[in-house]
């Protein structure tokens, strides 16, 4: 993936987000969980460990690998260019806000179990969660970069 193009990174991120949705419709997302205590009952079995790491753990590979691909894309951007930084900031804030607003609307339109598909909760990490989370993360990173470039000699601790 180090040599992947920006388009391939974004395609991979989007693909992983929707692959997770397909997995949720195919397999039991709650298998192995005691949701009343948020403990994973069969974690120390081979099947439970694989399921937890790949699919239904706190930070499963699918779809969390999408965040890595998006981070790789961000790392390739010319963040020294103030216009690029500001464009990335405003797009990321807009994307996060739109994802959250869309989620609120769709969850109200489709209440109950079907509304979970449109949620932005971390468990299960549905596509709108990935979009909102990535937008928020990029915005925070960009704000930190902006402060760093604006105040290069500032220190947090004396």
Enumerate the language-model features and the residues they cover.
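Alpha-helical transmembrane segments and their immediate juxtamembrane cytosolic regions
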Residues: 1-158
């Amino acid at each position: 993936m180090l040599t992947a193009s920006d388009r391939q990174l974004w395609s991979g991120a989007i693909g992983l987000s929707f692959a997770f949705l397909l997995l949720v419709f195919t397999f039991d997302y709650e298998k192995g969980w005691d949701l009343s205590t948020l403990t994973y009952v069969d974690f120390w079995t081979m099947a439970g460990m694989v399921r937890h790491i790949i699919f239904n753990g706190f930070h499963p590979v699918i779809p969390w690998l999408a965040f890595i691909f998006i981070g790789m894309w961000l790392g390739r951007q010319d963040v020294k260019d103030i216009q690029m930084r500001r464009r990335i900031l405003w797009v990321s804030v807009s994307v996060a806000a739109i994802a959250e607003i869309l989620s609120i609307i769709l969850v109200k339109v489709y209440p109950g179990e079907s509304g979970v598909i449109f949620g932005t909760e971390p468990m299960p990490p549905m596509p709108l969660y990935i979009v909102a989370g990535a937008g928020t993360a990029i915005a925070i990173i960009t704000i930190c970069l902006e402060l760093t470039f604006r105040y290069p000699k500032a220190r947090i601790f004396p």
